[in-house]
Amino acid sequence: MKIYADNAATTKLDIDAFEAMKPYPLEDYGNPSGAYSFSKKAKRALEKARKTIAECINAEPEQIIFTSGGTESNNHAIKHYTVDSDVKHVITSPIEHHSVLYACENSGAEVLTVPVDKYGTVTLDSFAEVLCRPREVVCSCDSHLVTIMMANNEIGTIQPIKELASCGGAVFHTDAVQAVGHIPIDVKEMGIDMLSASAHKFNGPKGVGFLYSRNGLLQPYHHGGSQEFGM
C-alpha cells in the first residue's frame, strides 16, 4: 500500500477537477481569444474558472491573472511591480520561498529583511522597526513593496497578514501558495494588494496558478498578446 504524507509539497488532483478539465484538451480546445463559437465556448469556461477563483478570495474576476504556478506569480508580482513603479526598497522575511527571495534580489531594489521569532513569525514590532529604519530613507519613499509569505510550507507558521498589511501603507504582496484552499482568505478585508497561488497545492492540476493584483497595480508585460490581459 502506498502512503503519501507530503501534501505540503503537492496534492493529488481532485477527481471533480479532473472531470471538469477533461473536455478542454481534446474536445473544446478553442482559442479563448477567437471570435467564433468554438472559441467562445472555451472563453466562457475560462471566465467561469476566473470568477470561481475570484470568489474564493473575495476579489473581482478581472483581478485574477492565470499563470503557470507560484514561481511565475511571485516573480511577476515582485520584479515587474518594482520596475514599473520605481520601487526603491523591498521588505521581506528570511523564510520566504526561493522564488520570492531570488526575485527580490534581482528586482533592482534594495532588500530589507525582517527577522522572525522562534516560531517563524514576523512580529508587528520587528516589521515596524524594519519598515521605518532608517525613517528618512524608507518611510519617506512613496513607493516600496512588502512581500511576506502567508503560510510556511515547512514549519506551518501562519503570518498575521492583515495586521502586517495595515502597517505603513506600503503595497503588500503575499505568497499564499501554501494557504489558498486551506485557510479563509479575503483580500479586501486583509488589505492584500497582490497574492500568488498554485493549483497543485490544493488538489488542482500542476502547471496552473494565478496572481491576484489590485486594479491598476501592474502594467502588461506581454506585448503583442491578448491572453490574460497582456499580463
Predicted regions and their residues:
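Pyridoxal 5′-phosphate
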Residues: 1-231
